[in-house]
């Protein structure tokens, strides 16, 4: 088992645990970023969980992204996606500041777009995007949260497509 595979498994575990705890405590959030405020309402110091989680995702995703992208002219997509995730994590107060709102929003959109482009053109596991879209749409419909948590579900499609495309590369 390579360091890159171990690192992506750690990132995946962090993502799943963070989301599982957030959903257990608060229900399905409007967006992943909204958990910053939900944790902050619970206890002020808990707001740090969101930025730390975003930082750890990048730290543990990058080895896999770089290894898979090593021979690709599109390796920069991994850096752009990572940069977007880092900016989202460092500008978590998107409801409190106009500047943070812009940085956060554009970074979140960029991170998702660049990650999905990486999945399509570098990982070659483009088929994970429609698969996860269908699975997540079904979950959102069954939980009746497709309207209230649309952003969260779209973010989940991007993250799950990225994680599974990396795992496919290493495990198949």
Task: Tell what function each PLM region has.
Residues 38-41, 65-73, 96-102, 144-153:
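Membrane-interface helix-boundary motifs at transmembrane edges
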Residues 56-58, 110-118, 135-141:
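Hydrophobic, membrane-inserted alpha-helices
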